[in-house]
Amino acid sequence: MPKYRSATTTHGRNMAGARALWRATGMTDADFGKPIIAVVNSFTQFVPGHVHLRDLGKLVAEQIEAAGGVAKEFNTIAVDDGIAMGHGGMLYSLPSRELIADSVEYMVNAHCADAMVCISNCDKITPGMLMASLRLNIPVIFVSGGPMEAGKTKLSDQIIKLDLVDAMIQGADPKVSDSQSDQVERSACPTCGSCSGMFTANSMNCLTEALGLSQPGNGSLLATHADRKQLFLNAGKRIVELTKRYYEQDDESALPRNIASKAAFENAMTLDIAMGGSTNTVLHLLAAAQEAEIDFTMSDIDKLSRKVPQLCKVAPSTQKYHMEDVHRAGGVIGILGELDRAGLLNRDVKNVLGLTLPQTLEQYDIIVTQDDAVKNMFRAGPAGIRTTQAFSQDCRWDTLDDDRSNGCIRSLEHAYSKDGGLAVLYGNFAENGCIVKTAGVDDSILKFTGPAKVYESQDDAVEAILGGKVVAGDVVVIRYEGPKGGPGMQEMLYPTSFLKSMGLGKACALITDGRFSGGTSGLSIGHVSPEAASGGSIGLIEDGDLIAIDIPNRGIQLQVSDAELAARREAQEARGDKAWTPKNRERQVSFALRAYASLATSADKGAVRDKSKLGG
């Protein structure tokens, strides 16, 4: 029978000092036999996805204590990728994931907490907390802040839906008037919550459902809707049950590594491919799998991408649907239901509610459930009122979207595409693979060949795109922006958005060892591995080299002879200490980022730290 971890600090005469300090936090004699549960919050006023979380930790804590636990809250950092985008701040985004994971480990282990409720939401916060949860392997439930309502405005006598990416594209489009750009900017992000499309934050929050670590509705129920409060109330009660199951009944099925098994990771990736999720999810799932000591690799993702169709299409791949529409169509469970009927899921998995996948689908899939309360929850809709307050409205759609032929979520027979929304490509400068979000690629450019325009920083590429130096047919190559080379693996949302602004969204390709925002669409290929800074062949590409992209056949090829590439590699190595570094880039890199770069692996490993350098 496992012993409560917290007993280390609450029992025995030699822990009198620790108990004295616990008493100063409000604990009493009656509390010293109860489980201590960490409420891991991420409130900040910097990030719209987290601005409403201040009081939600208290809400969870009250439920924990009512159920017989002791709740202790702390906060992690949270970087807003959208605000950090397009300048030096983006260097810090991905590294913040490791800091978040480490900070959770530090706090939980330093104070011997028994379990956790993780209140996350945005791009690196959910992955960081997920990595920590699987590293620590103590009972955990995730409950995120929820998606933002889609923006809406009237253009050309038509009401259209908007999000952050629209503001970026219109702001850079010289054909758009100042007044229209301002109108879109003011309408794009109307409420608190994670940006309203299937961007990285919402993708990851959806995947926690498929991993079994959050409750049904977590990925899609709007931040502003009153129904979301119930997820927080349930999490506080349920975590105490899970904690007691493990520590008092020796039931290891309550532990996250036994819930988020390899089968669950395969289900999560299957969901990701089917819903056209952000390419960043590949990085984060690979990283989380390593923390769980699960053998889940790019090869597994490649195999899944070849058999899973696209059953859901959401912004940025279309402007017709946003997360509020996914929820109306049944949310994550709705997509999982269609995947299950297609025979594409592992059914022998459970979630934090203790339900198997078939049981979860029977209760929560709107196509089969008989539960009116569940159907009512999935009718939760937007209010269209600007607010930073959680649970501030209770509007509902008149009807559910259960049309699996033409609705937001489709059945296998009516799939948007027989190929899924993500693909792994391999070739002579991506020997370990690269990732493309096929959901956002126009059919006309699934095969594409063009001359390379090579840039060794995102800034130089942006200047060239906006300066008219990139023309139709070009393949823009941005290198030395990987985890080690950036350092920090910047997102390339501005270059891809500016290609659209210049009318080149369907006429050019962009390839990088960096990564993309979940808001990216177009022929945008990232995570090229090995990265240039690690001696990857992307560092050998020269201006004018022809690059052939073949998404249907999962290929990407630099059309240069092996002999020529060998000669270029020899010349690169001859640069000595300067080998595999950018030639003409001035960038101030802090000590903190240099420390990150010294241990960073390429994207095919999840951009995690190289344990071999630490003796691990």
Swiss-Prot record:
GO terms for biological process: isoleucine biosynthetic process; L-valine biosynthetic process. It comes from the Bacteria. GO terms for molecular function: 2 iron, 2 sulfur cluster binding; dihydroxy-acid dehydratase activity; magnesium ion binding. The keyword Lyase applies. InterPro entries: Dihydro-acid_dehy_C (IPR042096), DihydroxyA_deHydtase (IPR004404), DiOHA_6PGluconate_deHydtase_CS (IPR020558), ILV_EDD_C (IPR056740), ILV_EDD_N (IPR000581), IlvD/EDD_N (IPR037237). One of its GO terms (cellular component) is cytosol. Its EC number is 4.2.1.9. Pathway: Amino-acid biosynthesis; L-isoleucine biosynthesis; L-isoleucine from 2-oxobutanoate: step 3/4; Amino-acid biosynthesis; L-valine biosynthesis; L-valine from pyruvate: step 3/4. Its cofactor is [2Fe-2S] cluster; Mg(2+). [2Fe-2S] cluster binds at C122, C195. It is an enzyme of class 4 (lyase). The active site is at S517. Binds 1 [2Fe-2S] cluster per subunit. This cluster acts as a Lewis acid cofactor. Pfam families: ILV_EDD_C, ILVD_EDD_N. Mg(2+) binds at D81, D123, K124, E491. The modification N6-carboxylysine is found at K124. NCBIfam families: ilvD, PRK12448.1. This is Dihydroxy-acid dehydratase. The gene is ilvD.
